């Protein structure tokens, strides 16, 4: 059999990232969120934390009355990265990480009620969160990978 014609067909598939509906932030609580970017999220006080299967755990410190959200990125969003003195523009981070332009607007971010970015799923965590618990950390963000 000749190898000619063996590679004539190309199949492309496009999958939704799970865009947050509209521009309204979705509040994260102790219950699991819907799936965004292949993961689901929950935020709870450290005292209520139980290890979840197939999950990344991010510890951080925030006021006890804080609220947390998942939303699409907004113009001017900045994230403080580990090892940096100044926050980096999220738009620049997405360029540096080679995120395709059509995906950038719908990429979810995890924020506090003061619009501080904690995590850009699949890209980078903020310097405010750590996978190791530190003194004073009173909140836990759990990122569970969706098993399809």
Predicted features by range, described:
Residues 1-148:
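AMP-forming adenylation/ATP pyrophosphatase catalytic core
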């Amino acid at each position: 059999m000749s190898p000619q014609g063996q590679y004539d067909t190309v199949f492309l598939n496009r999958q939704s990232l799970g865009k947050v509906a509209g521009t309204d932030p979705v509040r994260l609580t102790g219950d699991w969120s819907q799936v965004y970017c292949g993961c689901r999220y929950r935020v709870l006080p450290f005292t209520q934390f139980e290890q979840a299967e197939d999950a990344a755990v991010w510890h951080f410190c925030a006021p006890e009355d804080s609220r947390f959200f998942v939303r699409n990125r907004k113009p001017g969003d900045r994230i403080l990265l580990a090892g940096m003195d100044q926050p980096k523009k999220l738009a620049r981070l997405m360029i540096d990480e080679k995120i395709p332009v059509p995906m950038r607007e719908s990429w979810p971010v995890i924020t506090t009620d003061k619009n501080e970015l904690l995590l850009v799923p699949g890209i980078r965590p903020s310097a405010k969160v750590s996978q190791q618990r530190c003194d004073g950390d009173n909140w836990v963000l759990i990122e569970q990978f969706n098993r399809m």
